[in-house]
Design a protein with these regions (language model features):
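N-terminal Rossmann-like NAD(P)+-binding domain of SDR-like oxidoreductases, especially those catalyzing
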Residues: 1-146
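Short-chain dehydrogenase/reductase
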Residues: 85, 89, 116-124, 154-163, ...
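C-terminal substrate-binding subdomain of Rossmann-fold SDR/epimerase-dehydratase oxidoreductases
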Residues: 167-287
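Alpha-helical scaffold segments in soluble metabolic enzymes
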Residues: 94, 164, 206
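Short aromatic-enriched loop/helix-cap "lid" or pocket-rim segments at secondary-structure transitions
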Residues: 39-42, 149-154, 190-191, 231, ...
Length: 287
């Protein structure tokens, strides 16, 4: 199949492009060059273009479009909400206006249930536009994605929890800062549902090959919730390293708990939290 991946040089996009290419799909990647010379997909696709999804008007046609491009940091969205509305809403609308496809696949978020941040609001608005305009669609709601199959260099300032814990374990940071210890959870720290990036990418490929679901959303998570402190303990267990922690104030836009309500039938879970912790630690230790 002829497939476009927006956000192709990002964390999820680079893994997805590699797996799609291994399955003999013809992959085209778009991104805006945020990763500079260290292109994470230059070995996996012949067609990589520096295209801003908010600012193109040329017409294109693909069998499927996987729209991963977007702004994704909850705390940043509170500071610069307009940029999130522009990229995540206008960028999605522009893709729908200018790309002809029978199947539009969208990277939504678990944050969409609580609407506690401009990031979440922008993703829900994009979902609504897709339902109105796409010929056929599959809307995913991603939970907390982690792990690696070693192809992704993870440049930039990624701040997801498992990566930050792994940085401390690998000696790149002295202390892990935890946002709040007064949440209404078993140990006072936030609860999150983690999914391995390879499991998630394979679920996207399954969706591409099966065709549009046209359902409200497909949840990609494991239904296993872990507190921040439980993740710290798991990292200590698999690495044998002590993780010094520091509790600081709650982060604006955060929610107490995020666990998938129902796992999509598109997802085959093969990786555990231990796998994600060890993957991330090995990556941080060797880069």
């Amino acid at each position: 199949m002829k497939i476009l991946v927006t956000g192709a040089t990002g964390y999820i996009g680079s893994h997805l492009c590699k797996l799609l290419t291994e399955k003999q799909h013809a992959v085209t990647g778009w991104d805006i060059g945020l990763y500079g010379e260290a292109n994470n997909v230059d070995n996996f696709t012949e067609n990589l273009y520096d295209i801003d999804v908010t600012n193109f008007d040329s017409k294109h046609k693909f069998d499927a479009v996987v729209h991963l491009a977007g702004r994704v940091a909850v705390d940043e969205s509170v500071r610069i909400p307009y940029e999130y509305y522009k990229t995540n809403i206008e960028g999605t609308a522009n893709c729908l206006d200018n790309i002809e496809t029978d199947h539009f696949l969208f990277a939504g978020t678990a944050a969409s249930w609580d609407l506690a941040s401009p990031y979440a609001l922008s993703k829900v608005a994009a979902e609504d536009i897709i339902k109105q305009k796409a010929k056929g669609y599959t809307i995913f709601r991603f939970f907390n994605v982690s792990g690696t199959n070693t192809i992704h260099k993870q440049l930039g300032n990624g701040t997801h929890l498992i990566r930050m814990v792994a940085k401390v374990a690998a000696g790149k940071k002295d202390t892990l800062q935890i946002f709040g210890n007064d949440w209404n959870t078993k140990d006072g720290t936030c609860v999150r549902d983690f999914i391995h990036v390879v499991d998630l990418a394979n679920a996207i490929i399954t969706a591409i090959e099966k065709g549009p679901t046209n359902s409200p959303y497909e949840c990609l998570g494991t239904q296993n919730g872990y507190t921040v402190l439980e993740v710290v303990k798991e990292m200590e267990k698999v690495t044998g390293k002590k993780i010094p922690i520091e509790f600081i104030g709650r982060r604006e836009g955060d929610i107490e708990s995020s666990i998938v309500p129902e796992v999509s039938s598109l997802l085959n879970i093969t990786k555990t939290l231990s796998d994600m912790c060890l993957d991330q630690y090995n990556l941080e230790r060797n880069t």
